[in-house]
Amino acid sequence: MKIRASIRRICGKCRPIRRRKRVMIICSNPRHKQKQG
């Protein structure tokens, strides 16, 4: 899980979602998981 100020898609399978008022990126590749914070 990477925590970044600005999150962006790394590949075509990355999907932005909102959880607990935070934007996250979920992907089939676990290295692409990101959280905005």
Swiss-Prot record:
- Going by the entry's taxonomy, the superkingdom of the source organism is recorded as Eukaryota
Q: Which UniProt keywords apply?
A: Chloroplast, Plastid, Ribonucleoprotein, Ribosomal protein
Give one Pfam family, short name only.
Answer: Ribosomal_L36
Give the UniProt entry's GO cellular component terms: chloroplast; ribonucleoprotein complex; ribosome
Where is it located? Plastid, Chloroplast
> GO terms for molecular function, please?
structural constituent of ribosome
Q: Look up the record and give one Gene Ontology term from the biological process aspect.
A: translation
Q: Which cysteines are joined by disulfide bonds?
A: none
Which family is it part of? Belongs to the bacterial ribosomal protein bL36 family.
Tell me what this protein is called.
Large ribosomal subunit protein bL36c
Task: Give the organism, scientific name.
Answer: Pinus thunbergii
